[in-house]
A protein has these predicted regions:
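Conserved NAD(P)H cofactor-binding loop of Rossmann-fold oxidoreductase domains
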Residues: 87-91
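Short, conserved SAM-binding/catalytic segment
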Residues: 41-49
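A glycine-rich helix->loop->beta "capping" turn
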Residues: 49-52, 72-86
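Conserved glycine-rich Rossmann-like NAD(P)H-binding loop of the short-chain dehydrogenase/reductase
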Residues: 23-40
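Hydrophobic anchor at the start of a short beta-strand
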Residues: 27, 52-53
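Canonical Rossmann dinucleotide-binding motif of NAD(H)/NADP(H)-dependent dehydrogenases/reductases
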Residues: 1-28
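The beta1-alpha1 cofactor-binding region of Rossmann-like NAD(H)/NADP(H)-dependent oxidoreductases
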Residues: 35-36, 57-70
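Amphipathic, non-transmembrane alpha-helical secondary structure
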Residues: 14, 18, 22, 39, ...
Length: 91
């Protein structure tokens, strides 16, 4: 099982990513500007939960970047994502 969580580096998105990893999902964590937070979460999920995890940057307003995000998530997680959590927002 593979999931992509948009806005997954902090707050609710972070908790969703951890929740999914705890339940057996490999997780792609999307971020726009929170690279350090995303990288720390990837380390946590890999080391503490033993799941494949990757942080991927994209501007979700840009269609080409969204397509690249999905392709890279599929590539890095070893197959197509089966779960998409649209959590990204603008504060």
């Amino acid at each position: 099982m593979r999931a992509l969580v948009t806005g997954g580096a902090k707050r609710l998105g972070k908790e969703i990513a951890i929740f999914l990893a705890e339940r057996g999902f490999d997780v792609a964590i999307h971020y726009h500007s929170s690279e350090n937070s995303a990288d720390e979460l990837v380390k946590y999920i890999k080391s503490k939960l033993g799941k494949n995890c990757v942080a991927l940057r994209a501007d979700l307003i840009n269609e080409k970047e969204v397509q690249t995000l999905i392709s890279r998530a599929n590539e890095n997680l070893g197959g197509p994502i089966s779960c998409l959590v649209n959590n990204a927002s603008i504060f």
